[in-house]
């Protein structure tokens, strides 16, 4: 029983959940979901959130100045934008006579490598003024112990974990030890089948299972960590949290801040646990529950045990109060300790300080301190003066600087510090200005001309930026018309693949699907047979493994050896040979249609009969051939309370009335053959498939949302996309974000099935969408690693279309080769200038098969914009694979429902992808996941660096950096929307989340108004017409009224 009242326990749970808000969720790697690392701070303006994120995650929110300066030299930065922002900044400052601040700040950005304002613990502006003029510092020997004490106590605020303060003062490294112990505990508990030894008692939950082990952990006890004494104080994680925080002497007012700091030390693990505990249908979470309250309690237990261990061994403080008293009583010692163990000691004093501290010589410490403070103060003042002098020299304003008096130097230093805090945003806006001008000047605002000739084929691609090159190239090789749509084709669905035991949600993570689709083999003798293998997971709560089948160590080793040799020496050829030798994948169909009640009832009965056969064999050892169908049917009726006489089974096998009653009771309880479970089974079966009304709705929605409602071609290709690469834990990060990090082919097959159904087409015709009889929707797999386009389910293709099939394949093949030749140079260190398309395709295929290849494709790197509008806006423009292309025609959307959907789904997903790349590029070590070369897969759900580290949550260096420099250009997503301005703002106003992202600057927006020709850009609370900016090419005249109504 907990000693803590229920109200206090609930308060602590709420406190932990609130403290975890800034920590983003982290999904398992097998379904990698792009996310904004600062998602929990999106309620703040972008610039403010970045600053807070820098403090929370000890990261950098903007590129180093040197990288921006390189972009500036390459013409990727708008100098006019920099000038405007500098002028705006200066207008808010007091003037400094004699200094040209505009020139000074411009040179600071473009000519000075390092920050001008330096960290100063002791030197003030008067000291800097003296150093600037080569004078000795005044009162250099002065020693204000009270001020030092206050500075030290402020440095060790109550929100800072006590062990961090002790580490900094005594070099104990408890924080590192604590992190390692917590990580090991997480690895043991959250493992999903990778480890050969499983942690016992996991079904009890994280805290209970860990407690049971920790109380008996002899190794920790022998080293002096008396964990059992702590755990005996309460048997709930909330009670333990309250006990420890009270024991450490931390006032409740500071609990929020301390909890956030504890969680962000391992924000990868915290993000995974946070996601896992909120995922209701995640198999491993259902089996082995654990949440952040458990995680925090374990961390605090281990932390307190370490603090007590070190206190006994090294006499370090055990509470916040004792720490403060120690600082007040040993100020000189603590000041030198934090400098020495913090790594910022002046080199000339390092040996003396080390000797004095290690031999505990108080008098010597007191003697060292005055000279140390004098030297540190002089060092800080001289370093700051040198930085100011260097800046003035580069700006040609040395005389003006030297003419400033001490108060003016203070004013200048304050001004420069404030400017350098804003500098990152100035660089960012200037880079965005260049890209915005480039893409807007490529947009063609003209009335779409109706083409009389029917296209040979129409193709619907995912809006993914990797679709832009293949779409553009496909349009150049023939009479192809392409569209952009979210990769789940607007149909949210859960999916169970053939032979799989778990559902996969194929839709954006912000949507929860209601319908379930099953994959079944072609040629099954009956629908019951299909379901018997595919629907077992849906109908029974059995522990089915989602892992690959086991095979012997010898066989695994042999296969591994062949793979290692083949995929290293000749990866492309080896893959071709292996694919030829291995059996082809079984042909399958998707169960897309809703079941009738008779079908569902037949399935339930079939499964119940199978369970009764299993029960008879398990309970009595009787084989199936000894039991008649009539016996099974009678037992089923008895279990369902429809039959109350002695059964034929009991008579045949001489069961006593008691044995028969017990067996039937077991059928009800253990084998789930009862009325309530049948009702639940029928409800679950009702999830399978889509009704006719639903199918009509989704096909209509998909077609009208992209403006494809007439002039259908013979082939309408639905291209779902995914990637192929070997030895790549981040493979799902290259798959379809709109499909929850899975391949998009299933979604394409689902919509194709619906759109090809005659009943659906008849209903659509009544709604005004006439799909010709000779139009056939074909699902296509778009492999983004190789740009291959593979036609699917061709056995369903009407005979009348076979004659056109080779022409279609030739066009797709040509587009593939053109795209390969376009993408290859960026993947090579030394690309050939004259590589032909066939050779490019072969090299791209080799990369996909080569498991030594750390970068099989660039994925979504360099993504920068999303365009929602007609293809005429960008047709013929080379957008360099940087743009999400969403087809949209506002004229078919009078109520704005389709635009609502685009803004609240594809735009949000695009923003997550964009900011994942942005932050992984600006600070790959903290927001990204570092180099793949040091990664190890853990638990089958994540990666760590080396053997032990926080879960790496962002993108690896190989996804965003090239030769150590950003390959991804880190700018915010630019949304370009083609629709009347008033209409767009009215629709966006219905979506508070979207408006918040716009007004807080997480995305930038340009509205292209086809009725007025205006191009309106939103920036910091104001709308600006880009037509008034001479840097933008003039837009064409507005569309004529008769054209709009045509």
Swiss-Prot record:
Binding positions (Zn(2+)): 462, 464, 721, 736
Any one Pfam family match given in the protein's UniProt record, by short name: DabA
Subcellular location: Cell inner membrane
Keyword Repeat: no
Disruption phenotype: Required for growth in ambient air.
Reported cofactor(s): Zn(2+)
This protein's UniProt keywords: Cell inner membrane, Cell membrane, Membrane, Metal-binding, Transport, Zinc
Family indicated by similarity: Belongs to the inorganic carbon transporter (TC 9.A.2) DabA family.
Record-linked HAMAP family: DabA
Function: Part of an energy-coupled inorganic carbon pump.
Entries under PANTHER family matching the protein: INORGANIC CARBON TRANSPORTER SUBUNIT DABA-RELATED, UPF0753 PROTEIN AQ_863
Protein name as annotated: Probable inorganic carbon transporter subunit DabA1
Organism: Halothiobacillus neapolitanus (strain ATCC 23641 / c2) (Thiobacillus neapolitanus)
Gene: dabA1
């Amino acid at each position: 029983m907990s000693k803590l009242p229920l109200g206090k326990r609930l308060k602590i749970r709420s406190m932990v959940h609130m403290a975890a808000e800034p920590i983003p969720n982290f999904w398992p790697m097998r379904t990698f979901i792009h996310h904004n690392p600062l998602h929990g701070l999106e309620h703040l303006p972008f610039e403010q959130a970045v600053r807070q994120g820098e403090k929370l995650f000890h990261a950098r929110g903007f590129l180093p100045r040197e990288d921006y300066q390189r972009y500036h030299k390459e013409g990727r930065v708008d100098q006019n934008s920099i000038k405007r922002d500098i002028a705006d900044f200066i207008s808010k400052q007091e003037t400094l006579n004699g200094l040209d601040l505009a020139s000074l700040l411009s040179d600071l950005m473009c000519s000075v490598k390092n920050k001008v304002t330096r960290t100063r613990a002791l030197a003030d502006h008067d000291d800097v003024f003296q150093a600037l003029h080569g004078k000795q510092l005044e009162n250099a020997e002065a020693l204000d112990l009270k001020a030092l004490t206050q500075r030290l106590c402020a440095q060790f605020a109550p929100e800072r974990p006590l062990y961090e303060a002790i580490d900094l003062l005594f070099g104990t490294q408890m924080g590192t030890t604590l992190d390692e112990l917590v990580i090991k505990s997480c690895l043991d508990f959250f493992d999903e089948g990778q480890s050969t030894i499983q942690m016992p008692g996991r079904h009890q939950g994280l805290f209970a299972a860990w407690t049971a082990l920790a109380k008996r952990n002899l190794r920790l006890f022998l080293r002096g960590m008396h964990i059992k004494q702590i755990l005996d104080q309460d048997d709930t994680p909330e009670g333990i949290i309250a006990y420890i925080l009270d024991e450490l002497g931390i006032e409740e007012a500071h609990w929020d801040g301390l909890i956030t700091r504890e969680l962000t030390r391992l924000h990868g693990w915290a993000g995974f646990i946070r996601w896992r505990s909120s995922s209701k249908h995640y198999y491993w979470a259902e089996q082995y529950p654990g949440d952040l309250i458990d995680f925090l309690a374990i961390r605090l237990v281990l932390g307190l045990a370490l603090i007590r261990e070190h206190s006994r061994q090294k006499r370090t403080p055990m509470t916040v109060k004792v720490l403060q008293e120690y600082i007040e009583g040993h100020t000189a010692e603590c000041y030198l300790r934090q400098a020495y163990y913090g790594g910022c000691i002046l080199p000339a004093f390092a040996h003396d300080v080390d000797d004095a501290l290690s031999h505990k010589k108080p008098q010597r410490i007191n003697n060292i301190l005055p000279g140390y403070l004098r030297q540190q103060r002089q060092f800080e003042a001289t370093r700051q003066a040198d930085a100011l002098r260097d800046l003035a020299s580069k700006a040609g304003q040395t005389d003006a600087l030297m003419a400033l008096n001490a108060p003016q130097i203070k004013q200048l230093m304050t001004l420069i510090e404030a400017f350098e805090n804003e500098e990152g945003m100035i660089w960012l806006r200037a880079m965005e200005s260049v890209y915005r001008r480039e893409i807007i000047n490529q947009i063609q605002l003209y009335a779409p001309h109706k083409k009389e000739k029917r296209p040979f084929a129409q193709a619907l691609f995912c809006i993914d930026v990797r679709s832009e090159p293949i779409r553009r190239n496909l349009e150049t090789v023939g009479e192809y018309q392409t569209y952009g749509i979210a990769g789940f084709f607007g149909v949210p669905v859960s999916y169970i693949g053939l032979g799989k035991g778990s559902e996969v949600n194929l839709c954006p993570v912000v949507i929860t699907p209601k319908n379930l689709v099953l994959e079944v083999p072609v040629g099954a003798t009956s629908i019951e047979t299909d379901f018997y293998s595919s629907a077992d997971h849906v109908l029974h709560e059995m522990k089915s493994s989602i892992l690959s089948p086991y095979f012997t160590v010898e066989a695994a080793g042999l296969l591994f050896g062949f793979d290692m040799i083949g995929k290293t020496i000749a990866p492309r050829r080896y893959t071709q040979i292996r694919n030829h030798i291995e059996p082809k994948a079984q042909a399958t169909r998707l169960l897309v249609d809703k079941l009738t009640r008779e079908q569902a009832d037949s399935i339930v009965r079939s499964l119940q009969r199978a369970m009764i056969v299993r029960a008879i064999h398990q309970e009595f050892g009787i084989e199936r051939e000894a039991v008649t169908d009539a016996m099974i049917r009678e037992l089923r009726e008895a279990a369902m309370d429809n039959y109350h006489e002695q059964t034929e089974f009991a008579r045949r096998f001489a069961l006593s009335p008691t044995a028969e009653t017990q067996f039937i009771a077991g059928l009800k309880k253990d084998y789930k053959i009862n009325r309530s479970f049948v009702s639940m089974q029928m409800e679950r079966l009702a999830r399978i498939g889509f009704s006719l009304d639903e199918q009509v709705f989704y096909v209509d929605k998909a077609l009208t949302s992209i403006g494809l409602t007439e002039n259908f071609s013979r082939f309408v290709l639905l291209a779902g996309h995914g990637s192929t690469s070997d030895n790549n834990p981040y493979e799902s990060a290259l798959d379809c974000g709109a499909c929850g990090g899975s391949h998009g082919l299933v979604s394409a097959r689902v919509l194709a099935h619906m759109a090809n159904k005659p009943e659906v087409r008849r209903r659509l015709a009544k709604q005004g969408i006439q799909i010709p009889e000779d139009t056939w929707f074909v699902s296509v797999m778009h492999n983004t690693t190789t740009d291959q386009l593979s036609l699917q389910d061709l056995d369903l293709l009407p005979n009348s279309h076979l004659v056109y099939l080779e022409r279609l394949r030739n066009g797709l093949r040509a587009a593939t080769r053109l795209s390969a030749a376009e993408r290859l140079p960026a993947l090579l260190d030394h690309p050939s200038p004259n590589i032909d398309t066939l050779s490019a395709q072969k090299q791209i295929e080799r990369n996909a098969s080569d498991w030594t290849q750390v970068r099989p494709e660039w994925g979504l790197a360099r993504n920068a914009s999303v365009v929602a509008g007609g293809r005429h806006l960008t047709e013929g423009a080379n957008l360099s694979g940087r743009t999400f292309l969403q087809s949209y025609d506002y004229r078919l959307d009078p109520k704005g429902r389709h635009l609502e959907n685009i803004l609240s789904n594809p735009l949000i997903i695009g923003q997550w992808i964009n900011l994942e790349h942005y932050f992984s590029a600006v600070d790959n070590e903290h927001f990204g996941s570092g180099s793949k070369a040091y990664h190890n897969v853990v638990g089958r759900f994540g990666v760590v660096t080396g053997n032990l580290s926080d879960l790496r949550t962002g993108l690896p260096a190989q996804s965003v950096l090239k030769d150590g420099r950003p390959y991804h250009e880190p700018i915010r997503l630019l949304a370009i929307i083609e629709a009347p301005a008033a209409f767009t703002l009215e629709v966006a106003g219905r979506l508070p989340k979207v408006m918040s992202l716009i007004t807080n600057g997480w995305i930038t927006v340009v509205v292209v108004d086809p009725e007025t020709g205006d191009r309106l850009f939103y920036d910091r609370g104001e709308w600006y017409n880009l037509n008034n900016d001479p840097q933008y090419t003039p837009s064409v005249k507005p569309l004529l009224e008769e054209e709009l109504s045509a």
